[in-house]
């Protein structure tokens, strides 16, 4: 899967990572303890499961990443 966008933001002592994949409208999210190099344009292998996130009272579909590895 090819990464089209990768955003990292700090929340408490975690770094929240949001990755968008080519030809997929749903964001893939995961947490890390440290900042990571930008994955934009990289090919990655993902293990994930579907989930939902509540934003401003709306339920949004997200994918929770269990494992991400650069292919």
Predicted regions and their residues:
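Intrinsically disordered, low-complexity segments enriched in polar/charged residues with Gly/Pro
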Residues: 4-7, 22-24, 54-55, 66
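Generic short beta-strand segments
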Residues: 24-25, 44-51
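A generic structural signal for short beta-strands and their flanking turns/coil linkers
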Residues: 15-17, 40-44, 59-64
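Short, basic/aromatic beta-hairpin or loop at an interaction surface
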Residues: 11-25
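Structural detector for short beta-strands of small beta-barrel domains
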Residues: 1-13, 67-71
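OB-fold/S1-family single-stranded nucleic acid-binding modules
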Residues: 49-71
């Amino acid at each position: 899967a090819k990464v089209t966008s990768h955003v990292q933001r700090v929340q408490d002592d975690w770094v929240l990572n949001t990755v968008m994949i080519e030809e997929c409208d749903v964001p893939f999210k995961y947490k890390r303890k440290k900042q990571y190099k930008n994955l934009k344009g990289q090919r990655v292998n993902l293990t994930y499961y579907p989930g939902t996130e509540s934003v401003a009272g709306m339920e949004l579909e997200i994918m929770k990443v269990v494992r991400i590895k650069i292919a």
